[in-house]
């Protein structure tokens, strides 16, 4: 079940690096290669940015739209997979700048849904003993998506295969996600008991049945709910300890974005091609591989009392500052 859920943030990562390795065959003179699209750097930048725009729109509207449509976590991730499939098929069959930008916008909508719904889905399914490790799989799926897109793009460019192989891979992943989602995946029991019941579409009996199917005992989840913090009302403010933690996380995330990491993931091939024209795609591939390696340790350390979330976060922030 967890493997199916994390396919959604995989699309987010895939979209980030989807065009990176392809810049060489998109921004060029048509006479240099038959695969060249003849795009300008501004057009390539627009196509890249449309993914971010779509992600911003979807992340802001996902929660209220889901409540309005009585849609649970499963339905939202199925919508994400549908958008990913449409976007990938459109990108695979077009060569015009407008349609490429439209495909990227749709893919961004998928990514926006994924980054909102996936952490909640994992949190509501994870047993308390490994909740931190399960939550880390969200970020691992993102960096795996980034690496896969860079790998497929580098392979297509260096071996002179059609660049359409890159969106075709994401289309295949989306198709698998849809099939498994409709045939096997189940709704989040936490959502059924919480928002689902409030909206009149869920029940405790259905949640218990799903947990039984997943091999989870009710006693485990009773202890989880007993440990969870109370839900605040619309006019209530979070405790001061919450506010301090939220500020720390927000500042760290903003610092991560201002460090320029996204510029590397989106444009490393174009940046490095001016210095290492023949090795630029491989440098980008190495960067994404290191990203995966550094995401693996928290899987084991985040629930370890000797490390925990705070020390890992401080280590990450310190590393960014030193770099």
Map each language-model feature to its residues:
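Alpha-helical transmembrane bundle of multi-pass membrane proteins
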Residues: 1-197, 204, 208, 229-323
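TPR/TPR-like (Sel1-like) alpha-helical repeat modules
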Residues: 208-215
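Charge-rich, low-complexity intrinsically disordered segments
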Residues: 216-220
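Intrinsically disordered, low-complexity cytosolic terminal tails
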Residues: 221-225, 231
